[in-house]
Each structure stands twice: as structure tokens, then as C-alpha cells.
Amino acid sequence: MTELSSFKAPKGVPDYLPPASAEFVAVRNGLLAAARRAGYGDIELPIFEDTALFARGVGESTDVVSKEMYTFADRGDRSVTLRPEGTAGVMRAVIEHGLDRGQLPVKLCYSGPFFRYERPQAGRYRQLQQVGVEAIGVDDPALDAEVIAVADAGFRSLGLDGFRLDITSLGDDSCRPQYRELLQEFLFKLDLDEETRRRAEINPLRVLDDKRPHMKEMTADAPVMLDHLSDAAKQHFDTVLAHLDALSVPYVINPRMVRGLDYYTKTTFEFVHDGLGAQSGIGGGGRYDGLMHQLGGRDLSGIGFGLGVDRTLLALRAEGKTAGETARVDVYAVPLGGDAKVRLAVLAAQLRAAGVRVDVAYGDRSLKGAMKGADRSGASIALVAGDRDLEAGTVGMKSMATGEQVDVAVEGVVAEVLSRLS
């Protein structure tokens, strides 16, 4: 029989433990708050979907679909997949529930775990945490700029400032076919392995996304989409850049950037942080004008992004910064006696109702042991009371910073705590 102590989290799947987990929550909430301030409504998506949704939406030639998805047959012998990204699921929900029949654009935001089977490394896990937004139904370069600005504002609201925005355009339907032929002509002259040649036949852009050093060297002189844009695609891209300039969002035009998903068109972008080494991406996204129609819906445009919560937290730490409060509680209550347990439990409930974070010492610990718990809790105030103190109508209130303790009337404890914490 397996010992319980031998169980560990699956490889590449992190646990988020207090008090450090408070930083994780602060990063996630900070990125979401930037989207909500811009009018994006929350959507909660299934953890798993029909496998065909991702195969069709993300692209069968991508590493995500061909190598990284967690796919299995359920008890009804249906092929389902743990979601590797958010956009396809959002588009499915928009189509299924007719959200595109109302006011456009449909503006949605979400957060949660996503799953990809890749080699685990710092901040890059098999269960990754993301915050995403999608704006669906309007083909307007001003909307592209807003989406990018929301991500930029989210990072900056956390105090992150050492990141860079790379941006390019992947063109539209009027110029991509010609560029595809030009790129394939270049690639088929190279000495490609069988799998890479297959990718070049299905979607040659995937070859430019190959991270292997020898492939980067071989494709260094490959033609880039930015040099072959149609007039309409170029005007769209130039207008996006003009809006970003007006919004004071700095960017670097990176004509060789290729995202890892097949549905991107026109505006495409990535946020990178050099403090993270070779795996420098902390988020990215782009426009996906053909995806909704490809999934069986109306032919409406869309743009969105996914930001890595784990990666953003690592970037903050690389800058020597923290996110949010790390202290678990404000007040630690230490009851010494049976009656004191009841009375301090009531006071703890009253303080929590007033918005104060309160923990209580349980288990009949000694005063010395309970005060060690108060130290470890990070609380700034300890409330100490025995049955005799309560008979006198008082509670000891101790400053954990100075060690000073004063007696406070029971009925005045809540007001005094709020005053000290303000």
C-alpha cells in the first residue's frame, strides 16, 4: 500500500502556499482589474472542451495541438482536452450563447489554469495560470490599441516597469497567400527535417517560430510579412501604432515575431522581460479575424491577449519587487481559558465583519506558545485575554512592533483596533 507521504504534485504543476500565495493572487487580481476598468466583463469557462475545438481553432500544425495538449476519452468515449488556451473557449461560448447578437464589441475577461505538456522550467509550468481578455465583433485599430494598453496598464499597476512590448502585423487575407508562397519557396530550398518540412507545407509561419538554434540561423534571412502587407493591412497597423503613441504606450516593431497559435492575423504582439532569460515572454496576443467563422459562427473579427500570472510574478521578483500584502492577518487573538475562547471568538467575528483580518490561537496553547504563533502570523496587534480579564471587562491589546500592551474595555476593542490600523 502506498504511503500517503510519498504523494507529490505532478511534475510541472506548482502548489501556491501562503504567505507567498498572496503575491500570486495580487498579480492575478491586478491584471484582471485593469481589464474590468476598461469595461471587460468576467466570463468563467469550462476546464475541458471538445478536442476538435482546439484542433480547429488553435491549429493542427502548432506545437500546442500536436505535442502539448492533455487529451483523453471520457466515460462516454468522447475526446476531450484540458484547455491549453482561452480564446477558442471564449469564441465557442460567444457563438453558443449568441453574445455576438447584442452590443459589439463583446468585451470579456477571464483567469484561471490552462494546461500544456511541455518541459517544466522557471515560471513555465504544465499547469499555467493566465489572465486573458477578448474583444469580439469590431475591426477597429483603435480597439487593438485599447487591448494592448489594458495589458500595459495591468503590468504597470503592479509596479512592473522593466518589460518591453514587441509588435508586428501578420497581414490579412489579401496579402497572406502571396507571402505564404514566398516563404514556402524560401523554406523548401533549405535542408529541413521531415517534420519541419511538413510544417512548412501546412503553415510555413510555424517554421519561423522554431526555437532550435540551428533553425533560427537557417531562417534568419527569411522574408517577413511586414515587408509584404497589403495597403489595407499596412494602414491598419500604422493606425494601431499611432494610437499607441497617443496613449504613451512604448513599443518596438519586431518584424520577425511569430506567435505560437495559428489563428492570429494583422496586429500581433508580445510582452517580454529580459530579467527572465531566454524564456522572456510574460504575455501576448493579437487579432484573430477569421477564428469565429472557422468555428461555425458569424464572420466577425476579434482581438485578445493572455498574460502569464506565474511569469509576471517572476518578473516582479527579478526587479526586486513584491505584489500585494504578504502578511496573513492584522490581528491575532490569544484566549487563555474557556470563557475567553468564546468572547474572543465573538470579537474576532466582529472585527472580520469590519474588514479586519483576524486569526485565533487554538488548541489550549500556553501564552508563550500562542505569542510565537502571533509573531509568525505577521499580525500587528495581538489581543490577549483570560477569564479573569473578561470578568474585569477588559482585553489586553499588544503592539507586536513595540511589545507595549494596554488594557482596553471589551466594548471598545473593535473601535480601538480600527483606529490603530487606519
From Swiss-Prot:
GO terms for biological process: histidyl-tRNA aminoacylation. It comes from the Bacteria. InterPro entries: aa-tRNA-synth_II (IPR006195), aa-tRNA-synth_II/BPL/LPL (IPR045864), Anticodon-bd (IPR004154), Anticodon-bd_dom_sf (IPR036621), His-tRNA-ligase (IPR015807), HisRS-like_core (IPR041715), HisRS/HisZ (IPR004516), HisRS_anticodon (IPR033656). It catalyses: tRNA(His) + L-histidine + ATP = L-histidyl-tRNA(His) + AMP + diphosphate + H(+). Its EC number is 6.1.1.21. It holds the Pfam family tRNA-synt_His. NCBIfam families: hisS (TIGR00442). This is Histidine--tRNA ligase. It comes from Mycolicibacterium vanbaalenii (strain DSM 7251 / JCM 13017 / BCRC 16820 / KCTC 9966 / NRRL B-24157 / PYR-1). Keywords: Aminoacyl-tRNA synthetase, ATP-binding, Cytoplasm, Ligase, Nucleotide-binding, Protein biosynthesis. CDD domains: HisRS-like_core, HisRS_anticodon. Gene3D superfamilies: Anticodon-binding domain, Bira Bifunctional Protein, Domain 2. One of its GO terms (molecular function) is histidine-tRNA ligase activity. Homodimer. GO terms for cellular component: cytoplasm.
